[in-house]
Design a protein with these regions (language model features):
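Alpha-helical membrane insertion/targeting regions
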Residues: 2-286
């Protein structure tokens, strides 16, 4: 019994160090990922304002069709208003969302957190409503499958935004934070949609993609830009009540770092070729 004690103690010390290292690793990996998402999604939000909003106030709405055919059509004022609302509100949620994840802001500036949160929830509701109006009035370019996928996305946004505010107002903080994470996972979907398409077209030369967005890859993407996000967030929410083994934390940290590298590469590519020039052109016009 006495001989086994030093071995047991050494094992505990080693396990303690590994556990501490794994916690630090997962914390920093998560921080880097959230920071990358914030910067990239924020740039995409600015790009939306730069391209779509500038087309609106210059009266050149036909430019919308340069990026996605069928967004603007003369004589369809309701659909145009719906998609315009979707773009404007969507840009706001992309630029504001990651701010709400910063614990220091929530703790030190709760008033700021609440007001940004209200704007975020309102913008999420408006983005969802605008997109649903466009689908009901005109429909998406990808037909039935895209209509179903995007409509479900809009409905989930409405539910998540409503629940986020409802639980916050009632003081149910844990439930509020859980729904806020679900809302965030949905909100970055439009950004991930562009990122995924960009990488797929570059790496596979558009395999499975058709010009009318009715190919097998297009059908998959009608759901893929938000369903995996929700699954990941759901696992995160439910796993907080359980003790995670250090090696699993280290593996998760490596996975998060890989995702960060992937997003950094995509952000650099899109900013250099698309987002950056449009943003600079918009600012130079003031």
């Amino acid at each position: 019994m006495i001989k086994n004690k030093p071995v047991e103690l050494i094992g505990n010390i080693k396990y303690g160090k590994l556990e501490k290292a794994s916690m630090v690793s997962i914390r920093w990996a998560g921080f880097l990922l959230v920071t990358t998402v914030w910067i990239s999604a924020g740039l995409f939000g600015l790009y939306i304002l730069a391209f779509y909003a500038s087309s609106l106030y210059t009266g050149n709405l036909e430019r919308w069709n340069n990026l996605l055919e069928g967004l603007y059509e003369k004589g369809s004022g309701t659909a145009t208003a719906g998609i315009g609302l979707h773009f404007a509100a969507g840009a706001i949620i992309l630029m504001l969302g990651s701010i709400q994840l910063i614990g220091a802001i929530r703790e030190r500036n709760p008033l700021f957190h609440r007001w940004v949160g209200r704007l975020y929830v309102l913008s999420s509701l408006l983005a969802a409503i605008g997109g649903l109006i466009f689908i009901v009035v005109k429909g998406t370019i990808g037909g039935l499958v895209m209509n179903i996928g995007f409509s479900l996305y809009g409905l989930l946004m409405l539910i998540a935004a409503t629940e986020t505010y409802r639980h916050a107002a009632a003081g149910r903080i844990n439930k509020h934070r859980a729904w806020a994470l679900r809302l965030y996972a949905l909100a970055i979907g439009s950004w991930l949609y562009r990122m995924d398409y960009g990488f797929w077209l570059q790496l596979t030369n558009g395999f499975g993609h058709l010009h009318n967005f009715e190919g097998p890859f297009d059908s998959l993407m009608s759901f893929f830009f938000y369903v995996p996000n929700l699954l990941v967030v759901e696992i995160f929410i439910r796993s907080r009540n359980y003790k995670i083994f250090p090696l699993l934390n280290l593996f998760s940290a490596l996975l998060l770092l890989s995702m960060t590298a992937f997003l950094l590469l995509g952000t650099y590519y899109f900013t250099r070729l698309y987002w950056g020039p449009a943003i600079l052109e918009w600012f130079s016009g003031f």
